[in-house]
């Protein structure tokens, strides 16, 4: 992991097109701004983890349901 120290008002770049700017520091909270192309998806980590979990659940196939489909197809 790369660790970068920045003060309020300073920024850093990720690649050529993503800028992360430190807007404000209040106690233990840091407010940041991110400038990125519209095709770049930006999520808070906890939201991204929920999306990944939901996607995994959506593609799970119940083995019993799958075997029923195979059985029904053979009886045609």
Curated annotation (Swiss-Prot):
<comment type="subunit">
    <text>Homodimer; the beta-strands of each monomer intercalate to form a hydrophobic core, while the alpha-helices form wings that extend away from the core.</text>
</comment>
<keyword id="KW-0694">RNA-binding</keyword>
<dbReference type="GO" id="GO:0044781">
    <property type="term" value="P:bacterial-type flagellum organization"/>
</dbReference>
<keyword id="KW-0963">Cytoplasm</keyword>
<dbReference type="InterPro" id="IPR036107">
    <property type="entry name" value="CsrA_sf"/>
</dbReference>
<dbReference type="GO" id="GO:0005829">
    <property type="term" value="C:cytosol"/>
</dbReference>
<dbReference type="GO" id="GO:0045947">
    <property type="term" value="P:negative regulation of translational initiation"/>
</dbReference>
<dbReference type="GO" id="GO:0006109">
    <property type="term" value="P:regulation of carbohydrate metabolic process"/>
</dbReference>
<dbReference type="InterPro" id="IPR003751">
    <property type="entry name" value="CsrA"/>
</dbReference>
<dbReference type="GO" id="GO:1902208">
    <property type="term" value="P:regulation of bacterial-type flagellum assembly"/>
</dbReference>
<comment type="similarity">
    <text>Belongs to the CsrA/RsmA family.</text>
</comment>
<keyword id="KW-1005">Bacterial flagellum biogenesis</keyword>
<dbReference type="Pfam" id="PF02599">
    <property type="entry name" value="CsrA"/>
</dbReference>
<keyword id="KW-0810">Translation regulation</keyword>
<protein>
    <recommendedName>
        <fullName>Translational regulator CsrA</fullName>
    </recommendedName>
</protein>
<dbReference type="GO" id="GO:0048027">
    <property type="term" value="F:mRNA 5'-UTR binding"/>
</dbReference>
<comment type="function">
    <text>A translational regulator that binds mRNA to regulate translation initiation and/or mRNA stability. Usually binds in the 5'-UTR at or near the Shine-Dalgarno sequence preventing ribosome-binding, thus repressing translation. Its main target seems to be the major flagellin gene, while its function is anatagonized by FliW.</text>
</comment>
<dbReference type="GO" id="GO:0006402">
    <property type="term" value="P:mRNA catabolic process"/>
</dbReference>
<keyword id="KW-0678">Repressor</keyword>
């Amino acid at each position: 992991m790369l660790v970068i120290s920045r003060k309020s008002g300073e920024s850093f770049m990720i690649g050529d097109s993503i800028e992360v700017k430190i807007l404000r520091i209040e106690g233990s909270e840091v407010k940041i701004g991110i400038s990125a192309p519209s095709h770049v998806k930006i999520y808070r980590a906890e939201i991204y983890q929920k999306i990944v979990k939901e996607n995994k659940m959506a593609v799970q196939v119940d083995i019993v349901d799958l075997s029923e489909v195979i059985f029904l197809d053979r009886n045609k």
